[in-house]
Amino acid sequence: MPTTRNNIKLLYDTDDADCAAIIESLSEKNATYLRRRRLLEGPSAHAKDLVIECAEAIKQDSSPALLDRFIAQVSENATEFEILTLLVAGWFALRQEQWQVTEMLGREVVSRDHHDLMAQRLIDAARETSKDLETETDRWLRTRTCGAPFREMETRVNGEVHFCCSAWQPVPIGRLETADEGGFWNSDRAREIRRSVRDGDFSHCSRWHCPQIAGRRLPARTEETQSLKLELEEGPDRVILSHDRSCNISCPSCRTQLINLPHKETERLNQVFEDHLLPLVSKATKIKVTGSGDPFGSRHFRHLLGRLTQAGPAGRRIQLHTNGLLANERAWNDLGLWDKVSSVWVSIDAAEADTYSVLRRGGDFNALRKNLRFLGDLNARGDIDTLRLDFVVQAANYREMPAFVDLANEMNADGVYFLRLRNWGHVTPQEFKGLDVCSSDHPEHKDLLEVLADPRMAWSGVDLGSLNSI
């Protein structure tokens, strides 16, 4: 367990009281750091600034020898310390050009919480041997812009709202229940995130997990984008609905057991949709369901899809993200999806039945293939605009990536999307380290790089997404 004030003295007082005092002072500020990560201390109170402020204060009162002892204590016992302590030690290590120590401390934080942007930036800076934290990506971002904070929103299971996936941009802009009051779309946090994008610092965006950043796909800044307003009159043009985790299978990449909301909670979410979301989605041109579970395995999302096909303007507004096991002709008929769906993204994580049975617990590979043929036929006939197959890369499946490309071609898919495994808090940090083959310190990471060099991975339909950063 991470160190707390109750056991610091037991661990360190007898050996190094000065080092223990530093650790205790950081422990007292750890909760503040976690709040700052979400801009809960105010839009100008950034988490990165607190790390550097703490480091500067410690440096003023400490000898070089004490700082060396502090870095050594934390790095030798990294699993015992809280996040802020690890990051401050990582910052000192970076400034001293201890690149491997910096990266190790950053990875300890990421293994606990993949949302921590400071840890990601420390790792990237260490890889590029940059003492001041600035990387090539930061320099590139100063020339780029992103439209998501100006036209998109995503709902989350905990009732919070983000501009996009919380792994890409971890700061929530507000809560669902304030939607009808305009309470999140132009909140202080929303305006701060828009400012960071407009000004090119992208302070609240993940350089790792955002596929637009990792894949270098953001459009260039222009005079027009540099003068974008931070407070918007129009609501979102694209709405991503990810507030129900119900699913018909239990994939170990995101959960430990089957999740299916009880009827009472489903009824509550149905009412939330009617009261707070329907006015928003009725004006949106694109509506994605879902980034949290399965649109067909959730009673709530099935209700929602039925409402969407009945309400709003005609046309293909719906984007479906599904495991594919229930995405069949019956679903299209029952929910009135014909000529209402623009894109279908199918999460599979395997190219072989044996691997699929492990990584998609409760799934049936033969049933999936049958439904993929149905979706592929829709795509070939032009009944949907896009079909994509998705694959979360991890130690158990990375060798099947080229075969997954073959599967996509067989099923008339337009492309494949590979993404890094994330720790959503469902596994221990140590377990995550064993699964995260994308990490450069994983024992099979070099084998992954060889797989990425397979000629099939050069297909124009391959999108490496967040893997581009490796």
Predicted regions: what is each one?
Residues 22-23, 36, 64-74, 100-108:
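Alpha-helical repeat scaffolds
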Residues 28, 56-61, 68, 95-104, ...:
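Radical SAM enzyme [4Fe-4S]-AdoMet core and its adjacent flexible, acidic
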Residues 43-50, 82:
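Residues that mark the junctions of alpha-helical repeat units in TPR/alpha-solenoid scaffolds
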Residues 52-56, 84, 88, 92, ...:
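"A position-specific structural signal for the A-helix of alpha-solenoid helical repeats
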Residues 168-212:
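Membrane-interface junctions of multi-pass transporters
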